[in-house]
Design a protein with these regions (language model features):
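C-terminal and inter-domain tail/linker signature
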Residues: 1-306
């Protein structure tokens, strides 16, 4: 790969390799090389600029969870080494809450949770990132209710006026990556499925998902079958019935020894004015950042499905 060390076999090898090097091998200082000085890292809870802040956050996490592992489940990617590549990296993380930190007093609880990180890299350096961590899964396993944890964190940050601002179109910062993915058919297929779901066409679920589909959701929840898919998306959309749904990035891939798969980064922006996943309507303006992965295949004579 042009601009990358020949130690990497391909782009997924680079992404998985530097993740292990930074976290598990304690090569935190390598972030000066692997992350650009002015990188923009967006998560639902904040927008962070600069690799120095990333280094500080990494050290704080490892102080609280010193045995953390990051197991790469998949890297769905697009682009070229010459123009830059975007990876959507799905991780299953394990950790023990061994020290006091942002998640409260040490609980000794063993955790398992997922993260998806969309990272743009060129010349062996990441310069733009969108990061989603399953915070509900983390706090629930420690012993918090998600709402109580959020309220406690806001209080510790100095109250609503002083707490970190969540990601919204108003707080987002521009980064160097301007791409929208690729035109692979599997990315297009998954994007169409999600648009139909967000357009209230829930009949697409039994039509396009295998009846034995396994699905993973926030809170560390695993579902099986059409019902779980329907319940999650119905409940989410019902909470924001008039919100605008947008697909910001889509990737599809067909790789040897792998099923066809897709990664979609999407946003839902509008008022919380419906009953659903988040309880009684509050009228609050909400911006939801989401990243979804899907694998496609067929069983017997069945049509290709998720």
């Amino acid at each position: 790969m042009k601009g990358f060390s020949n130690r990497w076999n391909d782009f997924p090898d680079y992404i998985i390799g530097i993740t292990r090097e930074i976290w598990e091998d304690r090569g935190i200082a390598t972030l000066h090389h692997y992350y650009s000085p002015d990188i923009v890292v967006r998560s639902p809870s904040s927008v962070v600029i600069g690799n120095e802040k990333v280094i500080g956050a990494t050290m704080a996490t490892l102080a609280e969870f010193p045995d953390r592992t990051l197991l790469g489940e998949d890297v769905i990617w697009s682009g070229t080494p010459e123009d830059g590549m975007l990876s959507s990296h799905r991780i299953l993380s394990t950790a023990t809450h061994m020290a006091d930190g942002v998640y409260g007093p040490a609980s000794g609880k063993k955790l398992q949770y997922r993260i998806i990180a969309d990272c743009h890299a060129i010349n062996e350096q990441i310069n733009d990132e969108w990061l989603i961590r399953d915070q509900t899964a983390i706090v629930n396993q420690i012993g918090w209710e998600a709402k109580a944890y959020a309220a406690d964190l806001i209080a510790r940050e100095g109250g609503p006026e002083n707490a970190a601002r969540p990601l919204t179109p108003a707080t987002d910062q521009p980064g160097p990556y301007k791409g929208v993915g690729n035109d692979n058919e599997w990315g297009g297929k998954y994007a169409d499925i999600l648009r139909r779901i967000m357009g209230a066409d829930m009949a697409v679920i039994p039509e396009q998902y295998d009846r034995a589909v396994q699905s993973e959701y926030p809170g560390g929840t695993t579902g099986h079958g059409h019902g779980a898919v329907d319940r999650f998306w119905m409940s989410l959309r019902a909470s924001f019935p008039d919100a605008t749904f947008a697909i910001d990035h889509q990737i599809g891939r067909s790789d040897a020894m792998m099923p066809p798969r897709a990664a979609i980064r999407w946003a839902l922006h509008g008022k919380h004015d419906g009953w659903g996943y988040f309880g009684a309507p509050t009228g609050a303006e909400v911006y939801v950042l989401g990243i979804s992965h899907a694998e496609f295949g067929s069983l017997g004579a069945a049509e290709t499905a998720i």
